[in-house]
Structures are given as C-alpha cells and as structure tokens.
C-alpha cells in the first residue's frame, strides 16, 4: 500500500513538471489556464507547455524562430504574446492550429517579410500587432485568412506598400496604424467598404496626396494628436510631404483640431500651414502635351511606336483613342506604357488612320492627333484574277476598357523579343548589337534594322547581310532612349514576292555624354610644337639683341666719361708738374710706395683697359707730384730721369709707339727700383739720400698720345 502511494506521488510530480515548464509560472485554475514565461532568458519555445493553455506569454526573451511544432494542438490558446524577442523567421503554417486565437503580438522583433502562409488558419484573429520590426515586404495573400481583423498595427517598419486588396476585405477593421513607414500612395477606394473604421494613422510617410475616399468624407474631426472620442473618426497624416493642389481641396474643407501639417510643394506654398492656406490657392495646372509623334509611315507587318508626352499638375494620365473612336489598352498586338507610348507590334492595313493622344488631369485635358500610314505590301493574284489578301480580322488594339500598365503576358512577349536581340555594349554615341535568334526563315536575303530616338521620331534604316551576328549602330545621341527592331527580308515561297517579318525588338538608352580628356592628335600636336619652338627662338633672338644694345649703350657712355676724366687729369698733372723735387720722407711713407708700385703694374694692361689704366696712372702721378720719395728710390729714379731727358729732346711729332715705349720703360724702371730698394732696406732704419727729379713730359705731346689711344680703343670696341 505504501509503495502504491509513493508511486502515485512520483507520477503527480512528473505530471506537474510536464504541465509547467521550468522557470515559468503556470496558473492551472480553470477556466483561465495561463503560462507566464516572460523575461526568463529563453532561447526557444518550451516544448512541454500545457496544450490546454489559454494565455501564453513569452515576451522579453531571446527566441529566434518559430517552428511548426511549437504551438501544435494548442486549440484553446486565445492570447499569444511574443513581443521583444529576436524572431527573424516563422515557419509557414506555424499558427495553423490556433483556430481560437484572438490576439497575436509580434512587435519589436526582427521580421523582414511576411510570407503567404505565415498567418494561415487564424480565421478568428482580431488583433495583429507587428509594429517595430524591419518589414519591407508583405506578400499579396498574406492577410487572406485574417479577414476578421479589428486592429492591424504595422507602424515603425520599412514598408513602401501593403496589400491594399486584402485591406479592402477587412470589413471589421476599426484601427489601422501605418505610421512611420515609407508608403507613398494609397489607392482610391481602398477604404470604401470599411464602415467600422474609427482611426487611420498614416503619420510620417511619403504621401503627397490622399484620395477623396467616402470614409474621409464622413469624418467630422481630423485628429493629429491621437486623442479621439468614441463617436468620431480620426485621421492622422502629419509629417508627410503634402503637395497642396486642387486634389487636397476636399481635405482642406474638413474640420480639424490643430494646424500642425505643412505643405512641401508647390514652391509657392512650401512651408505654409495646411489649414491656414485659403481654398483659392489650392490650384492645379491643366495638362500640356509637350512632345508627340506627328506622322509615321511603316510597312505592313512592321512595328509602329507612337509617342505622346505631357506635363501638368498633377501629372496627367495619357490614353489613346483608335481611328474607330475606341479606347486602346493592352492587347495581343498593342502595348500602352505608363509614359504615354503606344506600341503596335504588328501593323495591318486597317490600322491606317488618325490616332488621338489624350492627356487629362483634374484641371482639364489636352489632345493631339498622330497620323499613321501603313504601306501596303503586294499579294499574289489567284486563278480568278482577284487579289487575295489575308483577312486581318477586327482590330484587336481597340477595346472599351481604360488603358493601364503592361500585363504579364505582354511583359513575357516583350522579354522574349528582347532576348533575341541583346545590346552588348552601349556608349554615348554607339551601340553594339548581338543577334541570338535562329535563322529558320527560308530564303532570307538580308536583315533590316530600323530605329528612332525618343527626341526624333524619324526612322533610320540599316541593311546588313543575313550572316551577320553583330552590328554596330553609330551616330547616336547621348542620353537618348532608342527603340530598335530587326526585320527579315525574304522571298515568300507562296507569293514569290519579297516580304518582311519582324524578328525582334529592343529598347535601350545611350550613356550620358561627359566631358573627357583626350590626347591631341599627332597632326595638331606637331604643328603646335613647331609654333612653340619657333616662338622660343624668335624670343631668344630678340632678347639677345636687346641685351647687346643695352650693353653697347652702357659701354659707350662709360667710354666717353672716362676719356674726359683722363684728359682732365693729364692736363692738370702736366700743367702742375713739379720739376726737381727732393724730399726726405719718414718710414711711415713706405705704404704709399707699395701702393705706387701696384699702380705702376696696373699700367701694363692691354689696349682694352687703356682707359682704366690711364685713369689710375694719371691719378697716381698727380698724387706723387706733391709727395716726397724715400731714399731707397733715389738711384733708380735718377737713372730713369736721365733716360727721359735724352728722349725728351726729340720733337713732339714722333710716332705714337715711341711715347708708349717711354711710358712702359718708365713703369718698368719704377717697378725694378722699388723691388730692389725694398729688398735692401733694413726694417728698423730709414736712410736719407738725395732727392730725385721726375722727368719732364711735354703736356701737348702727352695729351695727343692719350687722345690717340682713346680713339683706337673706341674703334676696337666698335669692331
């Protein structure tokens, strides 16, 4: 008996341990079975949670992913909280068994996308909280099973759009929080059937306008502070770059609680408070067609591209009207692009006529006519001499529906066509094409390439041989979009005539033309170098001539100045010459004697320095006429004076060389006598001797000789 009780006790402990996970708090009192595992440092969902749990709290942990088995068979769970974890992945159908779940909190995690089957099976979910994640994508069918939602919070994410079609089906939705995202457009009519909506928050997005939805028309109070009364509808749209034109006039006419919103455009209203702008300033600009195709001629079966561009405020929508007066949309042979271009892939004779381009916006509309001419190809005559033409049938480019963007089928056809022709390389002026199509058309003569630019609708044709695999298109405009098609020209075996067939088309844009550095061409470089070298030579010659002229002028001025000085000195010296002067000098005069010796040596210079030597010698002679010589100079001086007396008896008309010889001999005698006397003179005593007399030189003869020397010097300088 005791053993049985012991076993029952162990079984009870084991059951209790299995029901409540470790570290968690379990409230097992019926009917509120709750498992509280918040802030327990869990890395994953505990596997031993009681499947009868009604409320499960796993917030503030470190759970990284949700598996299919984590919440399997928990059909009684009503409230699931997974907030503030690190969840980045949720396995598809992970919540499929939670058919009674009312609230799911996944806020403050690391989710980046919501897949199609993530919330499958949550048909009774009322509150879905996904704020403060990193969501960038929500699949189009992600909310298909949560149509009973009453509150959807997608705030503080990175969403540019959400599946608006799924939102339209949430008829029970009363709170939608989309604030602090990057949503730039809300389709018109999205909230038309959401009659229970009481709060819409689109604060801090990229919305430039809000559609005039009936939901907003019912609004009585626009709340930007977030405080609303139960009976009112609150719209919060502050922090958006509103474009204040006539499209927001309906919003301006509604009541409001504050005036915090401002306009971001147009420029005249930038920065102004939305509610303070008068209604008459909410203006729109009517459309104006700025560029369109005037006329186009194409061969039957070729591709025709009609262009139409317009501007206005707001941006006008462009649609086309066929010659039959019907609205054109995407079909098997026609494509209407968002930029206003109409592309007829294969033309027929019935397409000839006037197509109408219509640009419209809330301010009005503008129209332009484009004439399309289809050149008919000849066909084979049958036996009854009637022309046999294939029946093109009704024109399938005319429909009664409004034109829109490209359908998936048309995108596939375009992609298939573009795969046949590839732009291998495109520059600002050229494009290299490669052909990938198979040449299965018999009798091909050649290929025809036709293209036209965005700014020039005139077709340009090029013919290439059928064996070509590449083709280089030249002379293109920079930064221009081109539509290029390749047609096969072949011999039709049935009609025995030449026919054409479109092989493929492609659209490409050339690069922008930037200023680039190029090397100078060799011809231009050679001519430039010759001009530069010639200029340097001419400049050098001019500088050399100028230097010579300046030097000659300076030398000429100096020569005239020195001649005058020499003549004056000699005239003064000869005029005031002292004959037979003998004076005894003290020892201190020896320095003057040495200076006199150096001046005597200076007089031996060449004829180029005669002017300077004459000036020096004359100045020294004039200075020594009034000074006495030392005794050591007596013997040499007396001998030189005797020689001068002998030569002085000759007439003054002797040749010039004799006068020069006398001067040189006199200087030589002075140097020799000075050298001998300085060598024999004792250092501490000065002997006195008889004084010597200088030789007399006739003033007129000496002046004549000096003038002749100066003239000869000037002649040599000129040479």
Curated annotation (Swiss-Prot):
Annotated glycan sites: 73, 330, 339, 382, 406, 452
Domain Fibronectin type-III: 414-503
Function as written in the Swiss-Prot or TrEMBL entry: Cell adhesion molecule that mediates homophilic cell-cell adhesion in a Ca(2+)-independent manner. Promotes neurite outgrowth in hippocampal neurons.
TM region positions: 530-550
UniProt feature, compositional bias: Polar residues: 628-641, 649-677
UniProt biased composition (Low complexity): 393-414, 615-627
SMART domains associated with the record: IG, IGc2, LRR_TYP
Gene that produces this protein: LRFN5
Organism: Homo sapiens
Topology class, membrane: Single-pass type I membrane protein
Start-end of each LRR repeat: 52-73, 76-97, 100-121, 124-145, 148-169, 172-193, 196-217
InterPro entries in UniProt: FN3_sf, Ig-like_dom, Ig-like_dom_sf, Ig-like_fold, Ig_I-set, Ig_sub, Ig_sub2, Leu-rich_rpt
Protein family (similarity comment): Belongs to the LRFN family.
GO cellular component: cell surface; GABA-ergic synapse; glutamatergic synapse; postsynaptic density membrane
Subcellular locations according to the entry: Membrane
Subunit details: Can form heteromeric complexes with LRFN1, LRFN2, LRFN3 and LFRN4. Able to form homomeric complexes across cell junctions, between adjacent cells. Does not interact with DLG1, DLG2, DLG3 and DLG4.
Signal peptide annotation: 1-17
One GO term of the biological process aspect: regulation of presynapse assembly
Keyword Lyase: no
Disulfide bonds: 308-357
LRRNT domain sequence ranges: 18-51
Annotated PROSITE patterns: IG_LIKE, LRR
Protein name: Leucine-rich repeat and fibronectin type-III domain-containing protein 5
Keywords of the record: Disulfide bond, Glycoprotein, Immunoglobulin domain, Leucine-rich repeat, Membrane, Repeat, Signal, Transmembrane, Transmembrane helix
The record's note on its domains: Lacks a cytoplasmic PDZ-binding motif, which has been implicated in function of related LRFN proteins.
